Amino acid sequence: MAHPHLLAERISRLSSSLEKGLYERSHAIRLCLLAALSGESVFLLGPPGIAKSLIARRLKFAFQNARAFEYLMTRFSTPEEVFGPLSIQALKDEGRYERLTSGYLPEAEIVFLDEIWKAGPAILNTLLTAINERQFRNGAHVEKIPMRLLVAASNELPEADSSLEALYDRMLIRLWLDKVQDKANFRSMLTSQQDENDNPVPASLQVTDEEYERWQKEIGEITLPDHVFELIFMLRQQLDKLPDAPYVSDRRWKKAIRLLQASAFFSGRSAVAPVDLILLKDCLWYDAQSLNLIQQQIDVLMTGHAWQQQGMLTRLGAIVQRHLQLQQQQSDKTALTVIRLGGIFSRRQQYQLPVNVTASTLTLLLQKPLKLHDMEVVHISFERSALEQWLSKGGEIRGKLNGIGFAQKLNLEVDSAQHLVVRDVSLQGSTLALPGSSAEGLPGEIKQQLEELESDWRKQHALFSEQQKCLFIPGDWLGRIEASLQDVGAQIRQAQQC
């Protein structure tokens, strides 16, 4: 086998060649290529005239000497038009019921069937066998068919509870296409002189029959790690809980896993990675409503769980809570404690400063910063005499915020532990302490836990950076995952600075 990274590079170059001259169809081409390389089927949904047939025609050039068959279904289509006419000679001379399949679906590697839902039962039943078993019954004989890719297309979905659902379930990849949207792309499409039927793929990039057969075996050897299976099972359970979620058969899950294995294989990896699960957004939907729902659920999975984002945030929350507990314990030890005086029969409890507090101006530190008078305050300066009078008689108390400017009126109180507490307009409080009595920096326990968490974050981010080199995943999804990881990292760093 070629070096995995060389294979990934080759498939990327092959896809780029197939995409030439097709505007805003890169994702569709890449997924159709992935389907062709893994022997799966694709359904293209969209209005007429948006290059659905051209996509299928292009895929023929991915393979050396591949044969293509395409057909536009109508209500009057017959099996002869798809699978080949009956051999009059065989019927006349030998009494054999046999079709002449040369040039028809049974001998084609790439098949495109437009307006698929207009096919009649006779065509559908034979087509189901062809998709499921890659076999075609020709008279008394069962023949293997070489079909590598079936692309079915329509401008509508099959009716619910119709005989078409069995065929629809066989279409593993489902893509919703629309007209060219970008102005520059639209102009390029209008002015392009490229012959759409020319082969854009160099012979050196085309897949040989031997390579294709070997790859089918090697795709099956790609492993499904436990943590990736857990993500898949989490998604399945979540979908089962949602009343509007589409029904996903066990067969579809099974086929989807092989597609994920193929994605990993052609990305140069030996195991399925969480990033491959994004492909499920194009496999599990049924209609427009379920398309949005599936994308939402996979987005939650990718940005919240696939790289342990939510788990790391939960750990961070526990660490922050523990830090707050330690801060509270430290506050109780280091806070300025005033002395309660007699005054049993007085209306107001009286206090005085400790005897060791003798400075004429006291600078007291806030155990946690507060916003007071539109200023972020970390310490307050009091005149000792003013503070003593307030402790004894109550009334108004003023202090200089951060030791600057005029003294400002403060909401100060003595709590049940005889500590001075200043409150902001929302009544959030901060205990006051003498300089030098407040703990400096993070406690060792908290610092170690945050360092371990940051180390785990770096590992997850490195894993994502390595896995995101995947041709088949759209860049906007990778961007959202990167943003979710960066958000977790920023919160960890912020906690380390507290």
Curated annotation (Swiss-Prot):
Subcellular localization, as worded in the UniProt entry: Cytoplasm
Tagged with keyword rRNA processing: no
Activity regulation statement: ATPase activity is stimulated by ViaA.
CDD domains referenced in this protein's UniProt entry, alphabetically: AAA
Main localization (coarse): cytoplasm
Cellular component aspect of the GO annotation: cytoplasm
| Any one Pfam family match given in the protein's UniProt record, by short name | AAA_lid_8
Record Gene3D superfamilies: 1.20.58.1510, 2.40.128.430, P-loop containing nucleotide triphosphate hydrolases
For the ligand (ADP), the binding residues are Y23, G49, I50, A51, K52, S53, L54, E196
Which reaction(s) does the protein catalyse, per the Swiss-Prot or TrEMBL entry? ATP + H2O = ADP + phosphate + H(+)
Question: Which keywords fit this entry according to its UniProt record?
Answer: ATP-binding, Chaperone, Cytoplasm, Hydrolase, Nucleotide-binding
Matching InterPro entries:
AAA+_ATPase, ATPase_RavA, ATPase_RavA_C, MoxR, P-loop_NTPase, RavA-like_AAA_lid, RavA_ATPases, RavA_LARA_dom
Please list the GO terms describing molecular function: ATP binding; ATP hydrolysis activity
Q: For this protein, what is the EC number?
A: 3.6.1.-
Task of the protein: Component of the RavA-ViaA chaperone complex, which may act on the membrane to optimize the function of some of the respiratory chains. RavA functions as an ATPase.
Q: Summarize the subunit comment.
A: Homohexamer. Interacts with ViaA.
Q: Which family does it belong to?
A: Belongs to the RavA family.
Q: By what name is this protein known?
A: Regulatory ATPase RavA
